[in-house]
Amino acid sequence: MLVSNVNRILIVKLSSFGDVVQTLPLLHGLRASFPSATIGWAVQKSFAPLLHGHPYIDNLHVLDSKKLGPCFKLGDELRAAKYDIVLDAQGLFVSALVARLSNAPMRIGYNWRREANNIFMTDTSVIATDRVHMVEKILRLGDSVGASRIPFLMDTFLASKPMSVDMTGDRKQLAALVVGASVASKTLSPEHWARIADMLFSGGFTPVLIGGPQEQAVAEKIEALASNPVINLAAKTSFTELAGVLTNAAVVVSSDTGALHLAVAVGAPTVGLFGVTDPVRTGNNWGHAPFITLDAGGLADNRNFRDVAADAKVVDDIPSSEIIAAVHKIARRMP
């Protein structure tokens, strides 16, 4: 289905960190295709700082929480904006409810049936059940309204953020190590990270530990285990400050988590570590910076990081030597 006249369009992508970042190519395509259109984005409060002030977004609609009361309150705001089209890039009940509350006459979503999201859509013909990258699925929403697919080089808005965090030591040749993930099976053990940090230090890099508040204890353990100095930024950066750090890094090493996708978005050379998640679906096929995938899981396409089999290959099974070799292959020389 192609739309002949796109005037006011709303993206609904409420969460999470990585999912919001992976929706940026859709935003870029919509703005390039419909330069005079009003583009809005509905996002959960926790992730709004990623998008606040973005030049391609005319209206940022912030959902305080996913409870029904805040959803209905946001609906008042969305109806006042008079959107013609809503693209539900989340595909869940709350995002579909937000789309419905906008009163937009055209509400386009995926062909899956999750949490009864389809009952609020006017069109659920966008294919999302095949084994392709999540960015590809999101871009299909843009296809449905005639948006062009443009090469995604980087998000210059996020890449322009300064590295404003206070760091001691040499800032050159920073190796950003994203030490956290939503579940332990998706990342390296603290001992493995400490070994990687020491090997990078010996190779002329300054290791920087990246993570949120939930990774603070893990980062402190890595720092204690490492034989050489590291810069510990866990729980010390906002989203925009993190963008600045990743933009200025010589290389990023990360498992499948939000910061991995942010590194891709700002054009940082990245080594992606996969095991219980599928790089076909969540790796990098959308950015243009150097990216090496190290996949302990082989060709398996039925991975479930929430229910990991006892014999499953996990990220911690990736040899340190392979990670370091990948780093040296793609790291850029910083001035």
Show where each model-derived region lies:
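Catalytic machinery of carbohydrate-active enzymes
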Residues: M1-P335
